Curated annotation (Swiss-Prot):
Taxonomic placement: Bacteria, Thermotogati, Deinococcota, Deinococci, Deinococcales
Enzyme class, broadest EC rank: oxidoreductase
Pfam families: Rhodanese, UPF0176_N
Residue ranges of every copy of the Rhodanese domain listed in the record: 128-222
Gene3D superfamilies per record: 3.30.70.100, Rhodanese-like domain (3.40.250.10)
Keyword Phosphoprotein: no
Protein's gene: trhO
Organism (species): Deinococcus radiodurans (strain ATCC 13939 / DSM 20539 / JCM 16871 / CCUG 27074 / LMG 4051 / NBRC 15346 / NCIMB 9279 / VKM B-1422 / R1)
Listed name of the protein: tRNA uridine(34) hydroxylase
Length: 300
């Protein structure tokens, strides 16, 4: 009898960042590019003068080797989280050289001045205080998939819009407690630094972000509603970092629930109720052809 095929191994997904002054980001980029290609990684790493940020995936052994390389390269305070994906979550591997590892667009000093970190239990305690202003720093399409109970949604389309939102909506709240959160914690390093720079006193953020919270907090004790949007093929994850139920609209990028996929304006790869009126018939025809080629195996 033929030997049974071994079960496919899940991909290990590593989300990581650290703010750290880098003397030669271009040299680090070259090393990471060569290492990732040898290890057959997929995903994106961003390198800048201020540090490193990214999400990558590969075999457990490959991710362990990448992690060891980063530690040996001086990233000794790396914010690092692993989860699993049943299918390849990214199409290719990229290492980008940028001005910022997460783009706020205004100068802040997250290596010198950030808010108070809270672990998940302390975060739950803070959320129970009705006087606390809880702010979701993510983009609107991320918030749509899920958020913390009682959180304010700034309804921004880019993190670059956050400073202007603060000036417009938090002016006069400098004496209040402000608690902020994001997917993995990196945006809150900059958002809390921004608020402290503007004179706010009591500024807090969730250490490790939503992903760490969902990993550590049982659903029965959770103040999280919905799923968490992630920037890979899983689209969303839930408690225990299990893959979620959402599917991305490849026209507009919104995460869609089963109910939204049952809407008459949903067509896989072409449109959903959020973008149906935003594209022309010519564009929809092009999307339809792209989807046909994808299903035929001509696109990946």
């Amino acid at each position: 009898m033929p030997e049974p095929h071994p079960a496919p191994q899940p991909y290990t997904v590593a989300a990581l960042y650290q703010f750290r002054a880098l003397p030669d980001p271009a040299a680090l980029r070259a090393e990471l590019l060569a290492l990732g290609e040898r290890l057959e990684l997929c995903g994106t790493l961003i390198v800048a003068d201020e540090g490193i940020n990214g999400t990558v995936a590969g075999s457990a052994a490959a991710i362990a080797e990448l992690h060891a390389f980063l530690l040996a390269s001086g990233f000794d305070r790396l914010e690092y989280k692993e989860s699993q994906a049943s299918e390849k979550p990214f199409k290719r591997y990229k290492v980008r050289l940028k001005k910022e590892i997460v783009t706020l667009g205004v100068p802040v000093a997250p290596r010198e001045q950030v808010g108070t970190y809270l672990d998940p239990q302390a975060w739950n305690d803070l959320l129970a205080d009705p006087e606390v202003i809880v702010v979701d720093t993510r983009n609107r399409y991320e918030v749509k998939a899920g958020t913390f109970q009682g959180a304010v949604d700034p309804e921004i389309d880019s993190f670059r819009e956050f400073p202007a939102w603060v000036d417009e909506h938090l002016a006069g709240a400098e004496g209040k407690k402000i608690a902020m959160f994001c997917t993995g914690g990196i945006r809150c390093e900059k958002s809390t630094s921004l608020l402290l720079q503007k004179g706010f006193q009591d500024v807090y953020h969730l250490k490790g972000g939503i992903l760490k919270y969902l990993e550590d907090v049982p659903q029965a004790q959770s103040r999280w509603d919905g799923e968490c949007f992630v920037f890979d093929g899983r689209v969303t994850v839930g408690h225990g970092l299990q893959e979620g139920d959402a599917v991305m609209c490849h026209s507009c990028g919104w995460p869609l629930t089963a109910q939204e996929r049952a809407h008459p304006q949903f067509e896989e790869g072409v449109s959903c109720e959020h973008c149906f009126d935003e594209t022309t018939d010519v564009q929809k025809a092009a999307f339809r052809e792209r989807q046909r080629m994808y299903e035929a195996g001509h696109l990946t």
